[in-house]
Structure formats: structure tokens, C-alpha cells
Amino acid sequence: MPQFSVDLCLFDLDGTIVSTTTAAESAWKKLCRQHGVDPVELFKHSHGARSQEMMKKFFPKLDNTDNKGVLALEKDMADNYLDTVSLIPGAENLLLSLDVDTETQKKLPERKWAIVTSGSPYLAFSWFETILKNVGKPKVFITGFDVKNGKPDPEGYSRARDLLRQDLQLTGKQDLKYVVFEDAPVGIKAGKAMGAITVGITSSYDKSVLFDAGADYVVCDLTQVSVVKNNENGIVIQVNNPLTRD
């Protein structure tokens, strides 16, 4: 099984850690009905994109001052469709395993992983207060409100990498290595643009779309990803039975 060594792990959230497609589509459809927008057309562009970009493109007359339109939409998702939200298989175990030294089995003093999502802080943080409560919100957590440029621009992932580098006192390390876990082609492209190894999850797109976007490995879910080694010197990740293009 293929293995690779990294210093940091960077995760998208929706579709990568948490399965939110039904909740997101339900809330967007409701908003589309209220404003006479074709949801089919919106869904061609929405996955992996920041909600504020979708608001500007499809709801130009909706008042989104201070992102209040986005917050209302994503509050609707979190408050009214929580029963449709679930964890991507293997996600919780993978995140928890990244917090433990494999040699001593003790909890590491600092987390080596971060979240980079296109969602709002309200929606993204809410999952760590509900279905990801056992994991807890990581210190480095980049949302769509923290960047000027959304995916496929690498700004979000680059910012998370730099913050982790600082927290872990790795600023002097020249050959820093990192992996990005993503379910959307725009996210895969963002990861590749900042020099990361990329692992695509087929929760939202066919494997061919993820490979075409540049994914180095593609899996069905995170049960196929395991931490072989994790200590102060780095992380060794194993991808079990990765999908192939054929």
C-alpha cells in the first residue's frame, strides 16, 4: 500500500470530513424558491465555492451586507437539517489518530492538522459542537470569511500551512511537506497549486473528475487512510487500496 511522509495535514470540511450535501442542497433550494432562481444552475457552481460568491452571482438583489445573507443561509443548514448530516466514514478516527504519538500513545502537545473550508464560521464551527464534538475544533481553522480568494486559489491552504508552521515552530524547516484532503476539484487544484500531496474523496464527484483535477490519490472515504507513524519528526500516512483511473 502506498505511503508518504508529511509534516502537516490540511482538510477541507464539507464532503471531506462531514457529509453535508443534503443539508446544503435543501437550504439552497429553499432560498432559490424564495427568489425565483434555478437551483440546477446554481448547483453547477456551488460545490467547493464560498457561499458569498454564490450570493453575489445568483442573488445580486439580496442584502448580504456583513455576510448576513450567508449567515442566515448557513444557520438554516445547521439548525434545520442537522438530521441529514453525517460524518464521512473514517474521518473521526483519522483526526483523532493525528493527535496521538504512535510510539508513546500520548496526546501530542500541538495539533499538526487544520481545517480549510469555503463555509462560514457559523456553519463550520457548528459541526465541531455537534457531530465532531469528540474531536473538538482545531486551533488553525480557515473559513471562507478569512480569505480574499476562494478555491481553486491556494490562499486558504497556504495560510493554514503558515499558521501551523509557526505554531509547531517549523519556520526554519526548508523542505516542509503537507497533504491536502479534498472532495472537490477546486480544492484539489488549490492543494496542487501550493505544492501539496492531494488525496481526493469521492463523496461528491466521480474519481475521474478528481484525477483530472490533479489528485495524487483517490479514495471512497477516509477508512482507506491511516496513520502509520506520528511523532515529533513527522507523520507517515498510508493509503489503503486507492482507486485507479481504470
UniProtKB/Swiss-Prot annotation:
GO cellular component: cytoplasm; nucleus
Cofactor(s) of this protein: Mg(2+)
pH-activity note: Optimum pH is 6.
EC number: 3.1.3.68
CDD domains registered for this protein in UniProt: HAD_ScGPP-like
Temperature-related properties: Optimum temperature is 40 degrees Celsius.
Domain of life: Eukaryota
Cross-referenced InterPro entries: HAD-like_sf, HAD-like_SPP, HAD-SF_hydro_IA, HAD_sf, PGP-like_dom2
Chain sites annotated for binding Mg(2+): 83, 183
Active site: 83 (nucleophile)
Stored SUPFAM superfamilies: HAD-like
Top-level enzyme category: hydrolase
Binding locations of substrate: 83, 92, 146-149
GO MF entries: 2-deoxyglucose-6-phosphatase activity; metal ion binding
Catalytic activity: 2-deoxy-D-glucose 6-phosphate + H2O = 2-deoxy-D-glucose + phosphate
Any one of the GO BP annotations: glucose metabolic process
Remaining remarks: Present with 2400 molecules/cell in log phase SD medium.
Protein family (similarity comment): Belongs to the HAD-like hydrolase superfamily. DOG/GPP family.
Function as written in the Swiss-Prot or TrEMBL entry: Phosphatase that is active on 2-deoxy-D-glucose 6-phosphate (2-DOG-6P), but not very active on fructose-1-P.
Protein name listed in UniProt: 2-deoxyglucose-6-phosphate phosphatase 2
